[in-house]
Amino acid sequence: MFITFEGIEGSGKSTALQGLAAWLQQRGHGVAVTREPGGSRLGRTLRSILLDLGNTDITPEAELFLYLADRAQHVAQVVRPALDEGMVVLSDRYADSTVVYQGYGRGLDPMMLRQFNDVAVGGLWPDLTILLDLEPEAGLNRALARNIREGMHAAEGRFEAESLAFHTRVREGYLTWAALHGGRYRVVDATQSPEDVVRDVVGIVAAALGDVSSGEAVSGRTGA
């Protein structure tokens, strides 16, 4: 099973993903945890370019193709091999991030981006996508505090430096895209405590796996 986590900056994707990974491992599932950009050796180099605060002059088109290169390598070297081994793959961001950030955020055509991504991933789309949703102001405050705390403000702060208007477009784009692809999307309220977010995510995945023994309520919602 291939599960991706999406959301604006500071939405808590990494925390929710790690909580889900622990739950899956406790139930005997093999789990591969990965991320974009940076899930492969080449991807780590591309991540340093894409997220560096000093690279504010990257054009939307150049940004797009750097992300596509990262993704193609990631799928070939990490995602497909793990799925072939029967593992549950959890990815912090995937192709939907490009559709939303470069499409709704930067103004490129989302449907064109979907087609480009189809080529990059060889048609491999997630079985389930969890969108962690909250207001952009709250997410940015979280993300900026995290980057400063971890000493990553310059190395990984390029998107946090974007305007509030940009992040508002991204958030609205995510909700629009989730509604268009409601069959695989579940939206979780990311304003809750981390523990409550993990509980909701576990409930969603337990239902998808048919794990009725988890005792967790499913409280995500499907896009229309």
UniProtKB/Swiss-Prot annotation:
- Residues that coordinate or bind ATP: G7, I8, E9, G10, S11, G12, K13, S14
Can you provide one Gene Ontology molecular function annotated for this UniProt record?
dTMP kinase activity
UniProt-listed InterPro entries: P-loop_NTPase (IPR027417), Thymidylate_kin-like_dom (IPR039430), Thymidylate_kin_CS (IPR018095), Thymidylate_kinase (IPR018094)
Please give the Gene3D superfamilies that the UniProt record associates with this protein. Answer: P-loop containing nucleotide triphosphate hydrolases
**Which SUPFAM superfamilies does UniProt cross-reference here?**
P-loop containing nucleoside triphosphate hydrolases (SSF52540)
GO CC annotation terms, alphabetical: cytosol
Keyword terms: ATP-binding, Kinase, Nucleotide biosynthesis, Nucleotide-binding, Transferase
Q: What is its EC number?
A: 2.7.4.9
Q: Which reaction does it catalyse?
A: dTMP + ATP = dTDP + ADP
Known Pfam families for this protein? Thymidylate_kin
Q: Which GO terms describe its biological process?
A: dTDP biosynthetic process; dTTP biosynthetic process; dUDP biosynthetic process
Source species, domain of life:
Bacteria
User: Hey, which family's this protein in?
Assistant: Belongs to the thymidylate kinase family.
The entry's function note states:
Phosphorylation of dTMP to form dTDP in both de novo and salvage pathways of dTTP synthesis.
- What PANTHER family does UniProt report for this protein, alphabetically? THYMIDYLATE KINASE, UMP-CMP KINASE 2, MITOCHONDRIAL
- Name the NCBIfam families for this protein: DTMP_kinase
**Entry protein name:** Thymidylate kinase
Source organism per UniProt? Nitratidesulfovibrio vulgaris (strain ATCC 29579 / DSM 644 / CCUG 34227 / NCIMB 8303 / VKM B-1760 / Hildenborough)
